[in-house]
Amino acid sequence: MLHPSITKVLSRQFTLGVWLLASCWFNFARPMGLRAEPASDGQVSGTASVEPIVLFDLTYLFQLNLGDERQRRRFWDESHLVAALEGLVNRTQPRLFIRYLKEPDDFWWGQMTQPGGWLAKRQIVRVGSLDELLKRFRGFFQGAVVWDERVPATANLASTIAGCDDLLPLRFDAQADSLYQHLIAAPGAIPVKVRLLKENGAQLFSGTGLIPGTSMPSSGSAKADAYRWLIEHYVRTGKTNPLWLGYYLDAFWLNCWRAAAPENHTLCNQDFVIAHRGVLFDLGVWDDEVPVDDPKQRLGTDPDTLKGLLRATYDRIHGNGIIQVAGFVPWAYKYTSARSPAWFAGGTHDGVPTEWHYAEILSCFNACMDADALGLGAMANASFYQHYPLAKRYPQNPKPTRANLAAQGLLDAQGRIVPRTYVAFYVGDYDSAAWLYRELPAMWRDPARGQIPLSWAFNPNLCQRFPLGLAWARERRTTNDWFVAGDSGAGYLNPGDLSPPRRFSGLPSGLAVWEQHCLPLYQQWDLTLTGFIIDGDGPQLTAAGLAAYAHFSPDGIVAYQKKYEGVYQGMPYLPMRADLDGTPVEAARAIREQTRDASHHFYVFRSILKTPSWHLAVEQAVRESAGDAIKVVDLYSLLRLVREYETETNAPASWNRSLEH
């Protein structure tokens, strides 16, 4: 994700065995019988199910006064319960769609239900109340798991247990008007199957003595003890799906809710992880400071617990797979130095270093992010979208050849590169299903799209939570819309941390499983280029790492740390030069300043959530100031030129070759 201006976002409001292992778990949510077979590349066919789709509008919750304690808890409780219910209901088929975030939900609902859409022939049933919704889907849950607000982490435990045991999460609340009392004490009550507090109402997790139900001494933190209990009783015992985790804010949100817009609690994101029986967690990553939500814990307790969770998950699959973690550091609320008029997140580390540190820890355990960063991090209905029937392959525009480069005027009549500066726009950041779901409609409806080459960095693993969006974009591409993998492939991790020594885990190399994870997704989405490899503060790619990328990303990589360009085993590579921001004129000026070095001729510039109209204005401003001396091309053409440049006879006589091999 790598957001140098992260606060601006808020202001805008395997081997075959590995693949079979993933498929076994994936069948919880997408059995083979529901997958439509492709009629041809990029097209699917299938028979619509006769089961109706239920639509429930939950947007009434945003009318509540969150400044009122009771209404704030209602907002949390109902959002939490409905997200869990949706995950259970949609586990094997798309049955329930929640209207939660009006603009994106209405847009994608409209796309699915319009003539010719995925749901065009499906019966739609609108349910008007929460009670009616629970009654309709009573067969999908066995009871309730009750959690303890005094230990906010138990909200995430409840979500995890809900997915594993087919339960609904309920916050214990003795007040008569609470959701708990309404569902537990009323006629036809939902039975309580698991209690995360004692029968007498005392805390189950106290941070003293032994961790309940184990012989393990307490960590001294009720928060950490709760997660360590979960690891022992659900992760190590095989109840959870080791291939999916979710890093989402726990119920501490009830204290710090003013830090960001209400939907940034990201409860609506939990449905997918619950559907897949994954683990939900919220833990800090720094061992040199205590977290704002647990200031009395000893230093390092949160990150030690996180590493314990990741190691237990890694051990479940014997290291033979990539663990995918939806969500992101809740930086506006916890674990960073973020400060707003209403809240201080309590840390000393800025957002980007915290992101990088978290990425390093994940990477050392073969885990990657689907990085739902706050500001645009909320996403509803991923458990529904996951059932969208994808084709086996989505071809994109034909990759450039020497003949194509010549036709574009990039090679002269002698086959040499025309001497000028070549620039490509890396259009990010789409390493998050939530960001794609929120931003894609505006980007794809921009009237300037298609006028200049843009290289869209849609991570291919987003097809697991938002296949509809990826397919929709591909089906509406222009000849100037190019697609590359974003940070750092089929998921955001630091690939340098896949090679030993892996300082946070000491585990053997994960490069082979990373390659096996990426390859089928690259093939499905016709990707042969990785537009950004984020190394953060971690180690650079080793020779083995470069070789792995050469296998599944043979048309090139763009790296964050590397300050040179070259070709490795036939794979060209370049450094990412700079992030473009500000007005188009300011961005054009930055390009002019960055490209003054006469020894370099190929440049990649990154933008974050910038529209096609903005990029067009930047390109026009560059042309006005530089004329034909700077040429904007797509990333595939740019890196093909780098490969051509490796051949002495194809380089202009005026250029000095300075590549590393």
Place the predicted regions along the sequence by residue.
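Active-site beta->alpha N-cap acidic-glycine motif
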Residues: 387-474
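Bacterial N-terminal signal peptides that target proteins for export
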Residues: 2-18
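Substrate-binding cleft of extracellular glycoside hydrolase catalytic domains
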Residues: 459-520, 524-527
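Catalytic grooves of carbohydrate-active enzymes
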Residues: 302-330, 423, 427-437, 441, ...
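Bacterial N-terminal signal peptides
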Residues: 15-27
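Preference for solvent-exposed, low-hydrophobicity sequence contexts
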Residues: 37-392
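Short loop/turn segments at strand-loop or loop-helix junctions that form parts
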Residues: 147-150, 327-330, 420-421, 425-430, ...
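Boundary at the C-terminal end of the N-terminal hydrophobic targeting segment
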Residues: 29-31, 35-38
